[in-house]
């Protein structure tokens, strides 16, 4: 399984603001994915969990870790150029079974058009 490297992550406030202000939001049961089309740029992803939306620091970190791991396992199926994506966790991301959270992320990425389907033999 591939790691999402430093080049694959949103790091600057400017990047997060650009995605938030100009991106399109796709809502799921456990998270929102905001996708900004950035032709020519490598695909990068960021994870956000607000204090008001999720809870204290331990809960926010756990929600981000859970989302990050699910996206990491699907990273090969995400186009490697052209998108900036921001995942915003809901409180339910803390308690949802892993499979429910994973299927929610897949559904939202699929509706955003940023997740390739699995090969027939997989």
Placement of each model-derived feature along the sequence:
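Positively charged, solvent-exposed patches that mediate nucleic-acid binding
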Residues: 1-122
């Amino acid at each position: 399984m591939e790691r999402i490297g430093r080049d694959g992550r949103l790091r600057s406030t400017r990047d997060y603001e650009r995605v938030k202000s100009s991106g399109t939001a796709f809502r799921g049961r456990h998270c929102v994915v905001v996708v900004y089309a950035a032709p020519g740029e490598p695909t990068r992803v960021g994870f956000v969990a607000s204090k008001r939306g999720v809870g204290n620091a331990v809960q926010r970190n756990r929600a981000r870790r859970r989302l990050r791991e699910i996206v990491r396992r699907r990273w090969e199926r995400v186009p490697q150029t052209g998108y900036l994506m921001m995942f915003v966790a809901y409180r339910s991301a803390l308690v949802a079974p892993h499979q429910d959270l994973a299927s929610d992320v897949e559904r939202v990425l699929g509706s955003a058009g940023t997740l390739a389907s699995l090969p027939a033999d997989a």
